[in-house]
Structures are given as structure tokens and as C-alpha cells.
UniProtKB/Swiss-Prot annotation:
Family statement drawn from the similarity comment of this UniProt entry: Belongs to the peptidase S26 family.
Stretches of the chain found on the membrane's Extracellular side: 29-191
Residue positions of the active site: 36, 77
Keyword DNA-binding: no
PROSITE patterns named among the record's database cross-references: SPASE_I_1 (PS00501), SPASE_I_2 (PS00760), SPASE_I_3 (PS00761)
Source organism per UniProt: Staphylococcus aureus (strain MRSA252)
Keyword line: Cell membrane, Hydrolase, Membrane, Protease, Transmembrane, Transmembrane helix
Membrane topology, record value: Single-pass type II membrane protein
Main location as per UniProt: membrane
Protein name per UniProt: Signal peptidase IB
Amino acid sequence: MKKELLEWIISIAVAFVILFIVGKFIVTPYTIKGESMDPTLKDGERVAVNIIGYKTGGLEKGNVVVFHANKNDDYVKRVIGVPGDKVEYKNDTLYVNGKKQDEPYLNYNLKHKQGDYITGTFQVKDLPNANPKSNVIPKGKYLVLGDNREVSKDSRAFGLIDEDQIVGKVSFRFWPFSEFKYNFNPENTKN
């Protein structure tokens, strides 16, 4: 009886250690704050952020990431441009390396926009702290925008983000459970 009880205690302790390691080093929960990613991610929803997977698999255009905006705040935004990309918006239309890109995650906000445009017109060189002579995203930098462009504070306001600011890639939404979703890339977006 004592041996069986000891085995249970050890098993439970090992399970807690494994959960701690997974939670600390692989996936961490994050609560969405604000409306900048609405309707893709809404205020108060909870997501799991993969903090090592993006380092091994890399970030791609369309990934949703959490990053340190400053010492006190983390933001969640969508990657629009990666190092080496030439990015330009013309009247709400995205062009990457000269090719028009679909952004299905903007459909809802385009239908319900308050003004003429939700994203507007800009090039990489127009962003804060950018090289005014180049439209190419430099190595180690990313262009990120919120899906709710009319309210989002994103690269248009603070410029390109450094790779070392990135906490991780959003893997799945787990709360509310009725809204569970595991892939936020454009080809899986229905708005």
C-alpha cells in the first residue's frame, strides 16, 4: 500500500514537472488584450503561444505572433513582411515583392470600415525608424499589422520589429472553448 501511494506521488510530481517545463519552455498561455486583431482574435480570448517552434520552423507571412512592444506590454499581430521582402500597400491592397496578395482575414473589417481605407497607402521606407532609401525589410526585422487596421497600433505606428522582440507564434485559441481554432494563416481564415 505504501509503495503504491509512493508511486502515485512520484507520478503526479513528474507530471507537474513536465507540465511546468512545457509551459515554461515550449508553449505559454496568453490573453488577448484589446481589439487590434478583431475579429480573428477578440479581447479576453486565450491562446497558446509556441515559444520555440517559430525559431526552428521560422516565421512566415500570415503567422500571428506575440512580441514585446516595450518593457511592460506584449502585442499580438500578424506578420505581413519578413526579411528580404519589399512590401507596399496601395489603397488597402498589399503587394509583396511586386505581387498582389490576398488578405482574407481583412474581409470583415473591409465590409465594416469607418473611413475610405483601413490600411491606406505606405511603403516600408515610410515606416518609423526605417531606412528612407529602401523598401526592403532588413535582416532580423519584421513588418506586423493588426487585423483590425482602423484601431491597431502596429508597424505603421512603431516601425518594423526586431526578431528578438518576438515571444512566439500563436498556435491555437483555447478559450472560449466554443471558439477553438488551431491555425491563423490566411488560407485557413474565414471572415
